[in-house]
């Protein structure tokens, strides 16, 4: 049994972004010339339009109609064309210097053509809105960002329908001002990506797309490869929809504001995501909220630099504040935790398949699950929090240590970087199960609370340890059951039953015969039947119909015993709370069993069936 919760971060509100106005630079070095036609302003779409509908109340707060608008008026737009000989523009609102173009005024700009060393710069008034339409454009810059938003109120980058576009940076970034440009797309202000085409972003030495304000993506298809983070937003990353293939040397999505810790959130309404990263799949400095989408995330350290001292964080979805998930499909293969919050994790829907080297789901404070389907196929500990509350959903988990673990404290390695096995304890910890169907296969404790354990409903099935000093049920405070089905099998050395304050009967029975477990009442009616997948020496059984004053027939494998419930609790186990037992062994064993009780427990531990 081990614990170690990670340092609690501040719970953040979703706030609007600051606008920062600073001057910056470019890539090419030829003499500037200015083109000669009239500039254009953004007008209502006359080509096509598309918007992303959402039933979520947050959607209108996260995105404007303009964020989702992919249409543009080509007849009034400024044309910018790249070629091997340089660039041209159809308006004096664009200055051209070789293969570097600088947009200076509000309007719509359609970019076409290819350059192997060019740049698009937006350097306009800080109240200006600019739409850049990429129409089979390919822009590579050898020493800076291919698209550099130096100043504007907001820039919209739209991929034209059925087009393929590229923005890339190669080589080391050469700084010519104090803005520290370090991405293939670098924006000092708000930037939104949308469209009905494809965009490939490549950064050999830095990030893929960076916004020092809000980064929004509402539609389109994106393939981003970066040495560092693929998507990075200082104040927020907000995604309405779209398809994303992200390959990164650090995080897939990274939102962080070290100047204002109330900012740096991630909000995803929908989308399809394939993330292969050497950092975290999704990393939010404050909150992470996901409404829907498909997420295939693989996060593993760089094998060439992996060591016991490597501080890289390699979690699936991580947040300094709350993680809230209400839907979606998640396939998470992570070297560290699958879901990790320094505050609370709340799951109300979605389908999860998680394979991890540490915790499947971890919260420093509370983990709440009220719906969804969660399959944790591999983990050190399955579900963890100071408080764990399960009221619905279907959960199947496999753990090499504890299945469900409630404890308190902080795991110093949890958010800042690498991971260690959790190792903490707290009497304030609690596990509450009121609904859902839970199946646990644990090599350590099946259900382990350093405080209380309360079961009021649901179905819980535990395949606990087959030997050693762990048990299928382990608690330090009080354990009560008032409803639901709870069956836990495991070794008998540290077996515990529920306590006498329970209102639903619970029995603990020792046995030397593993196999199907059946409980029948005195009329021969089957109250519960269950077949564990592992051998066991002890079983805890509680279900509706088990009451004081009745006699039950319990069969485990080929052994049978008759249990008379003279108390609400039959057999207290090695370290359980007070309880009494009585029964007639119908096999060849003795009445008293062979287990030694711990503090507060019964010395007999329940009858042993042979």
Language-model-detected regions and their locations in the chain:
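Bacterial N-terminal signal peptides that target proteins for export
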Residues: 2-13
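C-terminal motif of bacterial Sec signal peptides marking the signal peptidase cleavage site
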Residues: 19-26
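Disordered, low-complexity segments in secreted/periplasmic proteins that are enriched in proline
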Residues: 30-62, 66, 304-308, 408-428, ...
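N-terminal domain-start segments of secreted/luminal proteins
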Residues: 47-128, 159
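Extracellular beta-helix/beta-solenoid repeat scaffolds
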Residues: 108-171, 473-475, 479
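Acidic/polar low-complexity surface segments
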Residues: 146, 161-188, 198-200, 205-218, ...
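Surface beta-strand/loop "capping" patches
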Residues: 478-486, 490-532, 536-537
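Exposed aromatic-hydrophobic patches
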Residues: 537-545
């Amino acid at each position: 049994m081990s614990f170690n919760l990670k340092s609690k971060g501040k719970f953040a509100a979703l706030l609007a972004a600051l606008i920062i106005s600073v001057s910056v630079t470019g890539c090419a070095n030829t003499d500037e010339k200015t083109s000669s036609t009239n500039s254009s302003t953004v007008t209502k779409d006359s080509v096509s339009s598309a918007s992303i509908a959402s039933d979520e109340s947050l959607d209108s707060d996260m995105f404007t109609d303009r964020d989702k608008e992919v249409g543009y008026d080509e007849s009034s737009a400024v044309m910018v064309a790249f070629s091997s000989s340089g660039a041209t523009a159809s308006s004096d609102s664009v200055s051209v210097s070789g293969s570097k173009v600088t947009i200076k005024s509000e309007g719509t700009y359609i970019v076409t053509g290819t350059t192997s060393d060019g740049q698009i710069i937006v350097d306009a008034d800080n109240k200006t809105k600019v739409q850049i339409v990429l129409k089979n454009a390919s822009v590579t810059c050898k020493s800076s960002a291919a698209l550099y938003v130096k100043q504007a109120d907001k820039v919209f980058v739209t991929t034209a329908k059925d087009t393929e576009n590229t923005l890339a940076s190669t080589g080391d970034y050469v700084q010519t001002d104090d803005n520290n440009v370090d991405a293939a797309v670098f924006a000092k202000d708000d930037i939104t990506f949308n469209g009905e085409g494809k965009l490939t972003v490549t950064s050999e030495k830095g990030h893929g797309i960076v916004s020092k304000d809000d980064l929004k993506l509402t539609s389109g298809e994106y393939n981003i490869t970066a040495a560092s983070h693929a998507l990075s937003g200082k104040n927020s990353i907000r995604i309405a929809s779209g398809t994303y293939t992200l390959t990164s040397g650090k995080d897939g999505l990274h939102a962080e504001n070290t100047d204002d810790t109330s900012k740096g959130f991630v909000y995803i309404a929908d989308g399809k995501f394939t993330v292969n990263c050497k950092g975290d799949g999704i990393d939010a400095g404050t909150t992470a909220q996901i409404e829907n989408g498909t997420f295939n995330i693989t996060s593993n350290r760089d094998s060439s630099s992996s060591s016991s001292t490597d501080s890289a964080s390699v979690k699936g979805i991580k947040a300094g504040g709350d993680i809230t998930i209400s839907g979606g499909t998640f396939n998470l293969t992570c070297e560290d935790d699958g879901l990790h919050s320094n505050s609370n994790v709340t799951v109300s829907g979605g389908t999860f398949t998680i394979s991890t080297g540490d915790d499947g789901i971890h919260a420093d404070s509370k983990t709440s699950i009220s719906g969804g389907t969660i399959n944790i196929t591999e983990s050190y500990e399955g579900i963890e929090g100071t408080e764990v509350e399960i009221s619905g959903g279907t959960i199947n988990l496999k753990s090499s240590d504890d299945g469900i673990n409630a404890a308190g404290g902080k795991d110093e390695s949890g958010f800042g970087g690498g991971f260690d096995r959790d190792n903490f304890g707290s009497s304030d910890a609690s596990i509450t199960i009121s609904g859902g169907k839970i199946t646990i296969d644990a090599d350590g404790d099946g259900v382990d609370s350093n405080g209380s354990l309360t079961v009021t409903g649901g179905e819980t099935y535990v395949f606990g340890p087959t030997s050693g000093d762990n048990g299928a049920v382990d608690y330090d405070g009080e354990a009560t059951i008032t409803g639901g089905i709870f069956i836990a099998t495991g070794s008998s050395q540290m077996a515990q039953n529920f306590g006498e304050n329970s209102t639903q009967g619970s029995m603990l029975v020792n046995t030397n015969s593993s196999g199907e477990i059946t409980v029948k009442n005195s009329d021969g009616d089957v109250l519960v039947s269950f077949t564990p997948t592992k051998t066991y020496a002890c079983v805890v059984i509680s279900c509706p119909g088990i009451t004081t004053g009745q006699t039950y027939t319990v069969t485990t494998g080929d052994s049978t015993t008759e249990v008379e419930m003279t108390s609400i609790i039959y057999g207290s186990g090695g370290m359980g709370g007070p309880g009494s037992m009585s029964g007639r062994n119908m096999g060849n064993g003795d009445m008293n069993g062979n287990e030694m009780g711990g503090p507060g427990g019964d010395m007999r531990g329940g009858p042993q069936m042979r």
